[in-house]
Curated annotation (Swiss-Prot):
Residues 7-94 form the Acylphosphatase-like domain. GO terms for molecular function: acylphosphatase activity. Keywords: Hydrolase. This is Acylphosphatase. InterPro entries: Acylphosphatase (IPR020456), Acylphosphatase-like_dom (IPR001792), Acylphosphatase-like_dom_sf (IPR036046), Acylphosphatase_CS (IPR017968). It is an enzyme of class 3 (hydrolase). Its EC number is 3.6.1.7. It catalyses: an acyl phosphate + H2O = a carboxylate + phosphate + H(+). The keyword Ribonucleoprotein does not apply. Residues 68-94 are annotated as: Disordered.
Amino acid sequence: MFDHDKAVRVRISGKVQGVGFRYWTRDEAVRLGLTGWVRNEEDGAVVAVIAGPDSAISTMIERFRRGPSGASVSSVETEATQLEKNPTDFRITR
């Protein structure tokens, strides 16, 4: 059972598609013990919902600002969100 202190929806813009951003996000989120999902958007952005302890979410948001090698992040927008059900893992969705 996972205990989530909060969940945040994050929209990352810039050169973030075609550089492995979703796979990098999943790997970083798993390392931090976060759950949720990440997907590419039609407009070229990447959107993720991350759930877990405040400190891990803050760390992940800072990592989003840098991104993986090959990415060039121009903006990271966050907003608190409510989850319909607690995710038990971190997934890449389409």
